[in-house]
Regions:
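Domain-level recognition of nuclease-like catalytic cores that cleave nucleotide substrates
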Residues: 27-65
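Compositionally biased amphipathic helical and low-complexity segments enriched in hydrophobic
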Residues: 20, 29, 49, 72-73, ...
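Charged phosphate-binding loop/patch that engages nucleotide di/tri-phosphates or the phosphate backbone
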Residues: 55-91
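Catalytic cores of nucleic-acid endonucleases
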Residues: 1-37, 41
Length: 91
C-alpha cells in the first residue's frame, strides 16, 4: 500500500498532497476491484508519526507528476489495522 504525501507537478517544487491535504475522515486504498481497506485518516497519520523510521520514497520519478510517499508492506498494514497503539487517545 502506498500513501502519498507530496507531489512535484510539472517540476514546480514539492508540495503537500494526498494524506497531508485530505479533508476526508477515511483513507481508502483499493487493492483490486473486489478488495479494499478503509482506515481513519488520523489513525494512519498516528501510525506514520510513531513509525517515523519508515523511509519516504519517490514514485514516478521521471514523470511530469512524481510523488513521494510511504510504501507500507502487508505486515505494516496489518499492524496499522490491528494494534491499539494507533487508536484515538482517550482522556
Amino acid at each position: 500500500m502506498v500513501v502519498e504525501v507530496e507531489q512535484n507537478h510539472n517540476n514546480n517544487g514539492w508540495k503537500p498532497s494526498g494524506l497531508m491535504v485530505t479533508e476526508a475522515a477515511w483513507w481508502v486504498y483499493v487493492y483490486s476491484p473486489q478488495a479494499f481497506i478503509a482506515v481513519e485518516v488520523n489513525r494512519l497519520k498516528r501510525y506514520l508519526d510513531i513509525n517515523n523510521q519508515i523511509k519516504k520514497m519517490t514514485f514516478a520519478r521521471w514523470s511530469n507528476n512524481p510523488s513521494r510517499g510511504y510504501l507500507l508492506l502487508p505486515e505494516d498494514v496489518n499492524k496499522l489495522l490491528s494494534s491499539d497503539l494507533y487508536d484515538e487517545p482517550t482522556e
